[in-house]
Each structure stands twice: as C-alpha cells, then as structure tokens.
C-alpha cells in the first residue's frame, strides 16, 4: 500500500456542538463508515455528559444524515468540520431520550419472562491477582513495529550505558553494591507476582479433591449503585390531547430528585421544561426557570467593602431557553444528580463496565442456584409500556416480521460498510423476534392470549399476537398420527428450527425463510413463527399459495418449475438428491422432501417452510429400536456431510487407482433421497440412505470414541459439552447407548469416564421427560411438581406437600413412590435410548444431575447446601421456572472472514495480521453489540492469535473479556467459562503475572471439579502441569514437588504410563533444586524407563533424560568424594595445633565476605548443579 493510499484510507474530522461548554470532538474514521455509525458514536461518547440523542449533522450548512458511507458524501475531506445542531423531538425520539436518561440515572428494567434472578452474573470481579478493568487495546495495548524497535533500541542503549558505568567503577577499584548490580525496582506484573508469592501462593492449601460447596459456587449478588433520582416515569396526565400535541407537547413526566423535590416535566418538540402541573391539577404551562446569578451587594463589614453574593432569579421559559436535553434540565434541578451519576460511573468502572453493561442483542445466562431475593427499589416505569423498547421499535400487533427480515436480507452487500449495516440489523431483528416470541409464548401458556380458533381442541389452538404466529407443539390435527403423534409433532418443530438455522447461515438471497423460535415452558412446547405475508388475507378466488411440495399430504403434490429452480441450490447444500414422487394424478420431480412446502407470498417472494425433513431417515436406528416413541428419527446434517465426503474420497481414490489423470465426476449421485423409507423410492436410494445410517453407527461413533481415548479429541466435562461434541460429529443423542458400548470396549480411564458421562446424560434426559410430562398435566402446579419429583429422584421421600388453599392441586405424580419414580425414569431410558439405566446414579451424582436438569428445564433453586438422601427440597427452594428456548440466530460472516484473514497472516506478515485483528474486534462489536455469546468466541479466537504473535498484553486483555463474556452469556459454571479462565492463565503467565495466572487456574479447576463431580478428569492434568510450571518459574520448589506428586498420582489413575514420563522427569529436576539427589536419581531412572518404552531411544526427551541421569550420577559421585575429603580434612584439623586468637577472628570475616550478598545458602548449591546439568545437556545436543 502506498503512502497516498494510506492517507486516503483515514479521515480526521472535527465535530462542533451548539453548547459552547462542549469542546469539539475529534474523530479518526474510515471512509467506509456510515453517517449512522458517527451518530451512534456521538450518542455513546456523550451519554454521561449530556445524553445527546436528537440532532442533525451538517457539512457546509447542508445536512448529511443517512446511512450512506462517508466516502459517498460530496465535499467531505480529511480535516473537515461537521456541525452538530439540535433537532426537534417527535414522540418516538422523546421516549427514546427519556429511556436513555433513565439508564444514565441508574434505572434498569429486567422484567422479561426469560430473565431470571441474578441473570448475567460474573465471578471475574471477585478473582484475585488480576486487573479487573480491560484496557483500550486499540490504543494502549498494541504497539506498532516502529514503537517496538524504538523501545528495544532504548533498552539496549540503557544496558550498554549501565555496563560501561560498571566497568568504569571496577577500573577505579570502586565497590559495586548489590543494589547497583540489580535491576531497578518497578511495578511490573512479574515484580508484583514475585513479591506476593514470597508471602503466599494461591495453590497453597488448595484441596483438589474437594469440590466447591454449593454456597460458594456462585458469588454474592453484585448490587448496582442506587439511581441518581428517586423516580422518573410517565405522569398520570398522559397522553396529551390533540390540541396539546398541536402546541408541541409530546409526553408528561414526573420526577423526584434525591433532595426530595417533585417535578412535573413536559417533553416538548423543542426540549424539556418544568410545568405548573401538580398531582391534583393539570397546568402544562412552564414554570419560570430558576437561575442562580452572582451580583455585587453592599456589605456592612468592618471595612465597608463590597462582597459578591449569589442571587436567585426566575426567568420565564420560552422555546429559546428551554433545555433541549432532559439531562441538562435535571442537572439544573438537582445538585446531587450529576454528582451521583459521576459516583456511580466511578464505582462501575472500578468493577469493570463489561461486567454490568446491559445487553442489546442477547439474553444473559440464568444461574441454576440463586441467593434469596434482595431489596427491590420501587419504580413506576416498570409497568409503563410506553417506555418499553419493544414499542419503540414498532413491535406492535401490526409488525410484519417476515417483511422486515426479507427486506434486510435484500440489502446490498458490496462494500464492507454495506455488510456491517446488513449483518447488524439482521442480528438485531432476529433477537427482537426471539424476545417478543418468548414473552408471547409465556403468555400463551398462562392463558393470557385468546386463540383464533377457540372452538377447536386445546392441542389445535393457534394464536396471533404482536405479529407472531403461535401453535402448540402437539399433533392437534392428526398430521403425525402414523409416525408418533404428539411425540413426532414435538420433534418436528425442533427439526424445522434446525433446518431454518442452516438456511440462515447459507444465506440464499432468493429464498425467504420464517423467523422461528421454539419455547419449552412448564412442560409445554410453543412454536413461534413469523407468518407468510398474506396467509391470513387470501381472496376467495385466489390461486393456492403452495407452489412446491405437498399440498394435502401425499395426495396432492405441487412442483412449479420456477420454485424448483430456486430450491435446487438448497438441495445441493443439504446433499439431497432430486427424486420422483407420485401423487394421485402424476409424477413430480422434487429436489427437497415432499413434506417441505414452497409458498408464494403476497409480497412476491418465495417462502420455504415445514423443513423438518431436510435430512434422510436414520433407518438403521429405527430398525434396531422398534419401540422408539416416534418415526421422525433423522440423520443430522453433519452426518450427511461426513458420509458425502467419505463417498467422494472413496471415489477419488478409486479413480486415482484406475487412471493417472485428475478424477472428474459428478457429485450428485452421492446425494441422498430424503423421502426414502417415507414414500416409495428406488431400491438404490434406500440402499444409499441405509448405508449412510449405518455409517453413523459403524464408523462415526467408533472413530469419535477412539479419538477421545487417544487424546485427539476433548474429553467432555459436562452434558452440554458432550452434546456439542457428539452433534459436531453428526451423532444424535439417541445414540448414547452406542457411544457407551464403544467406550466400554476399551479399559482406559478416558473411555470409562466418557461412558459414565453418557450414562449421566441418559439419566438427565429421561428424568427431564418425566418432569416435563408431570408439569404439563392439567391442573398441575409446576412449583410443587418440581419440588416433589426432585425429592423422589434425588432424595428418599415420597412425602406430599400440603397445597395452600386457592392453588390448583398437584398432578398425579403425588401417587408415585421413590421406587416408582426411578422405575419410570429407567423405563423412559430403555424406550428412548435402548439402555438399561442403573438408577443408583441419582444417589452417586446428585449435584451434577440437579445442575443438568435445571439447565434443561429452566429451573432456579435457592442457593444453599442440600442434604441429598432424605428430603432435600422444600417448595420454597424452587425459586423460578423460566422458559427454555431455541431460536434462529445470525452469525456474521464478515467477522469470521476478518479473523480467518488474520489467522492466515500470522506466519506470513505479522503486522498485517495484527492490523486485521485490531479491525475485527470493533467490527464484531458493531454487529453483535457490547454483550453477546458470539463475542466470546471472537475474543477467544483473537486472544489466541495475539498470543501466537507474542502480543501478550493484547492476548491477556482479550482473554479477560472472554472470561467475563462467557460467564455472563453462558454461566459462571459453564465449560466455556472454565476453559476461558484456563486460557487466560497462559496469557497472564506470558506477561509475568504469575499470581493472577495461578488464581485463574485455581478458580477454573475448582469449578471444573464441582461440575464434573470428580478431580480425576483425564484433561485436568494439563491444567495442573501449567500451574506447576508457574510455581517452578518462581522457584517454589517445595510446592512444585507437592503438586507434581499429586499430578503423577492422578495420571496413574486416569492416563497411561506415557503421560507419566515427562512429569517424573520434571519431578526429578525439582528434587535437584532441593538437593535431594538420591531421590532425583531414582525418579530419573523411572522416567528414562518410561521414555524408552513409550517414546523410543531416538526421541529428544529420552536423550535429555539420559543426559540428566548420567550427569547427576557423576555429580553424586563427586559430591560423595567431596564429603569424604571434608571429613578427612576435619580429622586432620582436629589433630593439628589450635590457631591463634587472631586467626580465629579473621576466618569468619573471610567467610562472611565470600558469601556477602548471596543469601542463598543450601538452595544456591542446588541451583548451580541444575545449571551445570542443563549446560551439559545443551552440549550433548
């Protein structure tokens, strides 16, 4: 890139404000950024000072508002001045402004049905030995190549000057003190860590075998600071009449300040002012504005001089002098307002803003244990829907979700700015739909929304609310009667959602899919979808909307050519074969399953729905398990893709053997027929589907288990990670029994652990079905059902809770005994998984089962120590039952491409990779917002790349962000959070913060043991080895040895002898530092034996160990000879004449001078010997 291109790629702009107290804002931006992004930045940059929300931007007197990029604005050059002018409010802008001021004042609203108690909590602020506030990595952390070279040059010059000064001092026979020789004191992380570790070690006294108590698992609630106002909400004088609206009045507000004063405020098109209204009388006319001025008055003092005093005067309010910002008005009314906001921000900044900033595009994680409810501040605005963001964004009954979504999908994507705008709005729209759908589904379950077909059975009820179509996840119409009824209908909704999610990621421009969310709440499943445009407003004689697929089951099939051509790319992406289907009249050639429907919307777009059969039948599983509850067992998309690639590789290999030229063949013959074993199909299609189904059982499962056992795959920690790992390989969870069988073929500890975790997951999923069925029964009170069934499974009592008068009766589950409940779970396990479940697992792993069940059913329990085995749960212990949902989400391809480009440049051009990395982070934050689970992945990937590029400070900063984000979005005890803490320990170690690194490992491992239920997890050895390395670096030889010995014991239990060799080698080196040479020699012999057996004689580790053993043996002989010589010298000395008094006094002086400043004693000898051994090893190499 030339210098001219670099100059054009950056614009420097000045933004001026109408308020002279605000200095101009300097912006350094890219020409690709949009005007809207500049507007958003200004809103965020001045939220604490002024809360500017309604304004226009002008260049040379002309407005430049819009979504166009800066490069498209005529006359805009680097150095230009943009003038910001206040713009009149409308009702929408006024309400948005009030919400921003409320947020700034400290009011929050977490009343959504999916937001549980203590949602989004983090333990990061409670960890020790680490910086809690992430740095500005864009400016402070990342250094340019020139800066690094300049710093290295300066350091080299300083070192050279210091050496010259030392040489000069020695030449003059001047004594150089230890302080002069040592490095100057500093406050670097390494220096701090060393000082702290001399007093205490985080690993000291840590009992690995003991898991965290339930009381310690989640930290105490982090209460937000008190708001800067007593209240700020809509007044009861709302809404303004038509006549008042003509006067410019938009809203009426009521405010109470910390001083105890109450004000009635009018939101006007020109700003905000205090009205003459009171609680009992309405008068929107403005009160005179109280102004404090300074005037000189005659003072009657001794000297008779004049003194300046403050005088209060009242100025009439006009459209010219009213406050444009509500913030400014409140500052003038309350002296404590601005001070309290500044105090709150300082408190939040000290705790880390990332841990408290509210999300805009995601839901936060709900902990399964929560403290008793704390103090709740009164806030009238909580029940005022006018201040709801849902209404602000038009989420009312008339919103056309499908139209909004498809319009966004059709936005241009030619430039980076186009893609950022498109992806940000798509991500936000999908979340807005999910938010509205989950809230509506809860209302449906509570009976608060009337069905549009009330005369039909309850299972057939459908609802239309806020532009969203709701249906019950049951077979109310009999569509699935032949393949499993309600069970099949429930599964079909989940399969449909999976297919829609795949389509969202494929992002086909010509195909319109529906926003879809599936909500499970209190045992009931509600399917939420955006309606196809025009589906409820069809004229009487209009042609049928279904243009492709089944119209009325298999009796009538549609196959219009235009739709078929549009759907063909989708079939290729899903590896589906074009096949022939017969209806009552003729044959049809279909690319997708016959159950899929292509509809023509009234907006002219092609809509694709009913996608639950976009994968072939898992026929091998159904044949082997005839009692399975439904016939809708399909292959996962990952398995279809794996089988396709397997077939293509086999064909390539076959052709390569037959011909020398590059193989050329069509891949479509390797596609699968989705209607095979559903409708009549050719035998070759059925054989291909059966082969793919058997490929899962005979190839994918054994290979995955072997990979885990061999260490090439991760050994899962909990059920969620197990599910993700199996799904990633294309293994459905109904195959858990096959995974257990494959694992039990090996006698290794990894295989045993995998089998036990799979058995735990079978128990959890079977118990989930029992609890779900009991809660869904008519007349059941969910809270009582949960407490009762949990006591049956995790306790030993069938006691029935007394239901208070007025509440509905508990369901029939009260008739179950403990044995009957566990037998019911075992029966479900046999039916659904084909596995004979040992129900004693409920007594062996109660905490783990409670945690997993809570996550799958949305349960929150009171955080306390439960006495499992008796009657652990009371009704009051069930704090909350939350909706559990799966939904369509949009992942940014632009962000993924930026990170991939950075990854590919790491080894070729580090500066380019670093620049790409720096750009990808703000890009991701633009698309996803400040808080989002996708940001966790971005921070995690970016931190690793920075670590590989030796940008340790940047890696540590991003690692801290990943920890906070994963805790808030996935949970404090999630596997993501555990792994991110372990990764962060490496980054903290790289910057020299060993104390912080050890604290990270200690925290992660303690949560790991609690979640896993045992410290004998195969992968925990790596984390302990990292801790040992850190202790060794700090010369904590005794602790290093203790943890090495513990780790070797764990390795003997969960790993093979090969894993012990390097640990024993490291233990021997640690023993040398403690001068325990005999024990070190013994350990070296054991290590060398293991190295020879498992690594081979030619391996470098084997050679190094042999060198150490040989050198240590020789050193031991020398040490023994030295001891014998010293003993002989002592004997001769005792026989010689005694020295004079002078000699007796001089000898200690010489010895003292010799050892002056060393202060190492015994340890110094061990370190010298280790240094000699390392030198010999290097020489051998």
Curated annotation (Swiss-Prot):
<feature type="compositionally biased region" description="Basic and acidic residues">
    <location>
        <begin position="1160"/>
        <end position="1173"/>
    </location>
</feature>
<dbReference type="Pfam" id="PF13236">
    <property type="entry name" value="CLU"/>
</dbReference>
<dbReference type="GO" id="GO:0007005">
    <property type="term" value="P:mitochondrion organization"/>
</dbReference>
<feature type="compositionally biased region" description="Acidic residues">
    <location>
        <begin position="176"/>
        <end position="187"/>
    </location>
</feature>
<feature type="region of interest" description="Disordered">
    <location>
        <begin position="165"/>
        <end position="195"/>
    </location>
</feature>
<comment type="function">
    <text>mRNA-binding protein involved in proper cytoplasmic distribution of mitochondria.</text>
</comment>
<dbReference type="InterPro" id="IPR011990">
    <property type="entry name" value="TPR-like_helical_dom_sf"/>
</dbReference>
<dbReference type="InterPro" id="IPR027523">
    <property type="entry name" value="CLU_prot"/>
</dbReference>
<keyword id="KW-0963">Cytoplasm</keyword>
<dbReference type="Pfam" id="PF12807">
    <property type="entry name" value="eIF3_p135"/>
</dbReference>
<comment type="subunit">
    <text>May associate with the eukaryotic translation initiation factor 3 (eIF-3) complex.</text>
</comment>
<feature type="region of interest" description="Disordered">
    <location>
        <begin position="1130"/>
        <end position="1181"/>
    </location>
</feature>
<dbReference type="InterPro" id="IPR033646">
    <property type="entry name" value="CLU-central"/>
</dbReference>
<dbReference type="GO" id="GO:0048312">
    <property type="term" value="P:intracellular distribution of mitochondria"/>
</dbReference>
<feature type="compositionally biased region" description="Basic residues">
    <location>
        <begin position="1150"/>
        <end position="1159"/>
    </location>
</feature>
<comment type="similarity">
    <text>Belongs to the CLU family.</text>
</comment>
<dbReference type="InterPro" id="IPR028275">
    <property type="entry name" value="CLU_N"/>
</dbReference>
<dbReference type="GO" id="GO:0005737">
    <property type="term" value="C:cytoplasm"/>
</dbReference>
<dbReference type="InterPro" id="IPR025697">
    <property type="entry name" value="CLU_dom"/>
</dbReference>
<dbReference type="InterPro" id="IPR023231">
    <property type="entry name" value="GSKIP_dom_sf"/>
</dbReference>
<dbReference type="Pfam" id="PF15044">
    <property type="entry name" value="CLU_N"/>
</dbReference>
<dbReference type="GO" id="GO:0003729">
    <property type="term" value="F:mRNA binding"/>
</dbReference>
<feature type="domain" description="Clu">
    <location>
        <begin position="379"/>
        <end position="622"/>
    </location>
</feature>
<protein>
    <recommendedName>
        <fullName>Clustered mitochondria protein homolog</fullName>
    </recommendedName>
</protein>
